[in-house]
Curated annotation (Swiss-Prot):
This is Protein RnfH. Residues 100-110 have a biased composition (Basic and acidic residues). It comes from Paraburkholderia xenovorans (strain LB400). Residues 86-110 are annotated as: Disordered. Belongs to the UPF0125 (RnfH) family.
């Protein structure tokens, strides 16, 4: 009997999360796991041409071979650049007058 892989496929949209367990033959690829899970039918908004995929937080190509107990993840596009988001949080903290927000300013402007 050939070895089987236990794989989880997960995706989180803004309002719903899905974690789907599938069993695949040894040597299966990330693309095969996505197809077997049916997640692309459940979430038609997923576009694999633009959205990134990975295993346990590490980006992988669709033809990457999976290992037993891997978790395949489909990543949504970022709504805001992380650098811009952090800058906004610091500005908000500065406006509130917190010492924490002022520590990023030059010592002369404190």
């Amino acid at each position: 009997m050939s070895a089987r892989l236990s794989i989880e496929v997960c995706y989180a949209s803004a309002g719903e999360q899905a974690l789907i367990a599938v069993e695949l033959p040894e040597g299966a690829t990330l693309r095969q796991a996505l197809d077997a899970s049916g997640i692309l039918r459940r979430f038609p908004q997923i576009d694999l041409d633009t959205q990134k995929v990975g295993v346990f937080g590490k980006l992988k190509p669709l033809d990457a071979v999976l290992n037993d107990h891997d978790r395949v993840e489909i990543y949504r596009p970022l709504l805001v650049d992380p650098k811009v988001s952090r800058q906004r949080r610091v500005e908000k903290t500065r406006k509130a007058g917190s010492i924490e927000g002022r520590r990023w300013q030059n010592k002369d402007s404190r």
